[in-house]
């Protein structure tokens, strides 16, 4: 990656719905993301976290302003849905369809079968149709297909959804040594604090704010119901902070984790 990875320049996005009417998700937001940045994204319900990831990958265009990609960017986006998988394919066919061999973050060359085994797909599972896999297994396969493509920027939208305890540990360990740029949306506090270096919040008023105090600052902001984060492009007040869903609470308990409803 060069010095320029992802840049938002005066980006504005407005959405409308019958329930909430017209709302501005982003109001002239300017933000630069560099090589090796590891960012956790949190925010109020409906603030636009998924929309922001879609702006980054180009599937959503801003109403005004510009989203710029670095010249050497290879971006992969893990969405909350698993409908990008072909249910008629077998597990091995699905991975080979991306690439037969790949290079790991450690520099070691690995085959599709090697990685599948590392992700818990062995024996009969290799020839199992995707449509016959559990939701957690499909999520695991979706992650593996992204990593096989050797991206240097990862966008992860609720990556811990449906993952079993072993896959959670494997994903955390992999991302710990992954050298690229990482942007994660998650309600799993442990996961964010393990794999991300900084936290940014979508405040629900069209602004994106850096939280130097991390998730603890967000929790304090939620308790006080008054603005406290540092300014990015523009930071205003917000009257209601999201109450995140628990998500995989049993798994957190199994690992003696501190999963908070923040």
Question: What kind of feature is each model-predicted range?
Answer:
Residues 2-262:
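ABC ATP-binding cassette signature C-motif
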């Amino acid at each position: 990656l060069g010095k320029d990875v992802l840049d938002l320049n005066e980006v504005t996005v407005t959405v409308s719905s019958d329930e909430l009417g017209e709302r501005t998700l982003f109001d002239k937001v300017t933000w630069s993301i560099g090589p090796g940045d590891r960012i956790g994204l949190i925010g109020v319900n409906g603030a636009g976290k998924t929309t922001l990831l879609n702006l980054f990958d180009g599937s959503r265009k801003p109403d005004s302003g510009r989203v710029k990609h670095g010249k050497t960017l290879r971006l992969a986006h893990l969405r909350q849905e698993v409908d990008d998988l072909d249910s008629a394919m077998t597990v091995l066919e699905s991975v080979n369809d991306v690439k037969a061999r790949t290079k790991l973050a450690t520099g070691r060359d690995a085959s599709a079968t090697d990685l599948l085994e590392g992700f818990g797909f062995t024996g009969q599972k290799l020839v199992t149709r995707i449509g016959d896999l559990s939701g957690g297994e499909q999520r695991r396969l979706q992650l593996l297909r992204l990593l096989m493509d050797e991206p240097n920027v990862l966008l992860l939208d609720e990556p811990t959804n449906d993952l079993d305890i072993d896959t959670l540990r494997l994903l955390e360990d992999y991302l710990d040594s992954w050298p690229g740029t990482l942007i994660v949306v998650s309600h799993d506090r442990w996961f964010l604090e393990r794999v991300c270096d900084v936290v940014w919040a979508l405040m629900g008023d069209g602004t994106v704010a850096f939280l130097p105090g991390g998730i603890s600052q967000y929790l304090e902001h939620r308790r006080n119901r008054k603005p406290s984060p540092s300014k990015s492009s523009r930071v205003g007040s917000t009257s209601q902070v999201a109450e995140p869903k628990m998500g995989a609470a049993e798994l957190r308990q199994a690992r003696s984790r501190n999963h908070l409803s923040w």
